């Protein structure tokens, strides 16, 4: 294990976190809020500490798989630990455990909150809270790679560990250039949504914070009723951008390079839009009697379907009051998640497709043991390692889901509350059902349960492996 390499990466993360905190500081200056100075002080401490750590240059810089996974996991933990401090210093979230929960929820783009009154926060803290979504959406190390060379070509192992999905696609030969392209696309989508929201009457502060939550698929609102208080037009704009943010960013690269035909060849994207269309239409018809018109039912249905499948977590209505069938569909969408290579969470549609294709193959092998049948995705054969990795991921995923549900049951809340609390944090969604529904929060859980849910949020965002590897004794042995 090259500890100097990992330390250097953590130092860079701290430097960038210090720079990130300038945004809430400037916001506080605009609104004349003294809380802004807390962010400035912690930002300076992060930057100076990061500079001190990176003073010593790394000899023979190289990131192997082991260093990549450890560096990514520790980077997200360090980012969250320091990111939570301003909430405590300002006194807006006095408990450090609660502040850490809120911060991890932000960076992992989960959007689960312990706050019962979001509107009590200052503009300064609301901006930081939402901006963590944008930083975590595409990945903090991917962001840093787009600016700094870090460790040269070996940074592909960092991107593999941080990027969502069963595999990572290089858009261009160099990792740094791939990171730059991804963030360019990310920034363009962000700017377009901000402009559209402002044009249709949303205040600039609201536009910025809600766009960070939409494009990063986070879901932290700045009002207690989430998105319900905005006009139908604004809700529809957010619906569109939530759905677009759940698309594999390779599709946008095809648009940039004028390869539009390639988009329609991507099986995952076709299935993604098919699920949204089918689920949205069914739910709209199912909840028709709850709203004044069919159009209103469709608006709420497609908003919530888009919000849940992309793991954004915004809400225009209390969907916990919907019929059981509609709620069950939303729970299924929680597990399915968005496309691989997007900012969305969940199990990912690509993995689901691989499993769905593997099942008939396995059944066929039972009858015809000597049959050679190749599983294909987008016309290309899926290699054995990807298939095995998907199966193992599924097993670990449900193991964590069940164990976490068991652990937080010590707080004695009902099964629906506990199961959907774990599902919503592990899949980085935010709201669940019943006690953690869209009009509730996670504040009622004990500190022990909050730590379990924090683990789930980090595990879900980092695709399980980086966080779990930290608990392997063999990892830390010096050879």
Regions found by a protein language model. Give the residues of each.
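Membrane-proximal intracellular helices of multi-pass ion channels
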Residues: 1-479
């Amino acid at each position: 294990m090259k500890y100097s390499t990992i330390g250097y990466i953590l130092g860079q993360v701290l430097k960038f976190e210090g720079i990130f905190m300038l945004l809430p500081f400037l916001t506080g200056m605009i609104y004349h809020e003294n809380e802004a100075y807390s962010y400035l002080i912690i930002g300076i401490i992060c930057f100076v500490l990061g500079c001190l750590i990176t003073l010593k240059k790394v000899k023979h810089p190289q990131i192997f798989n082991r260093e990549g996974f450890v560096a990514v996991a520790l980077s997200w933990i360090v980012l969250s630990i320091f990111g939570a401090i301003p909430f405590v210093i300002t006194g807006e979230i006095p408990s450090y455990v609660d502040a850490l929960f809120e911060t991890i929820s932000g960076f992992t783009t989960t959007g689960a909150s312990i706050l019962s009154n979001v509107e009590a926060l200052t503009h300064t803290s609301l901006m930081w809270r939402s901006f963590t979504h944008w930083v975590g959406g595409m990945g903090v190390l991917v962001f840093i790679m787009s600016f700094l060379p870090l460790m040269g070509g070996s940074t592909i192992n960092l991107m593999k560990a941080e990027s969502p999905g069963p595999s990572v696609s290089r858009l261009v030969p160099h990792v740094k250039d791939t990171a730059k392209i991804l963030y360019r696309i990310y920034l363009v989508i962000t700017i377009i949504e901000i402009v559209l929201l402002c044009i249709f009457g949303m205040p600039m502060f609201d536009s910025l914070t809600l766009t960070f939550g939409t494009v990063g698929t986070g879901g932290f609102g700045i009002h207690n009723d989430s998105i319900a208080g905005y006009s139908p037009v604004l809700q529809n704009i957010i619906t569109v951008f939530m759905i677009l943010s759940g698309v594999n960013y390779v599709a946008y690269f095809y648009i940039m390079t004028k390869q539009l035909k390639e988009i329609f060849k991507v099986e995952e994207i076709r299935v993604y839009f098919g699920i949204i269309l089918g689920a949205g239409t069914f739910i709209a018809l199912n909840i028709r009697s709850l709203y004044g018109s069919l159009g209103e039912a469709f608006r709420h249905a497609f908003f919530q379907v888009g919000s849940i499948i992309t793991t954004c977590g915004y809400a225009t209505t209390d969907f916990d009051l919907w019929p059981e069938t509609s709620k069950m569909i939303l729970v299924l969408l929680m597990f399915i998640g968005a496309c691989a290579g997007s900012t969305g969470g969940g199990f990912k549609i690509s993995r689901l497709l691989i499993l769905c294709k593997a099942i008939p193959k396995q059944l066929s092998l039972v009858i015809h043991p000597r049959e050679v049948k190749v599983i294909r995705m987008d016309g290309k054969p899926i290699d054995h390692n990807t298939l095995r990795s998907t199966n193992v991921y599924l097993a670990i995923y449900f193991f964590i889901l069940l164990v976490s549900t068991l652990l937080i049951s010590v707080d004695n809340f009902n099964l629906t509350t506990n199961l959907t609390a774990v599902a919503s944090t592990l899949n980085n969604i935010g709201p669940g059902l019943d006690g953690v529904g869209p009009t509730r929060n996670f504040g009622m859980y004990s500190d022990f349960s909050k730590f379990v849910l924090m683990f789930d949020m980090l595990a879900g965002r980092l695709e399980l492996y980086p966080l779990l590897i930290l608990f392997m004794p063999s990892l830390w042995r010096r050879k």
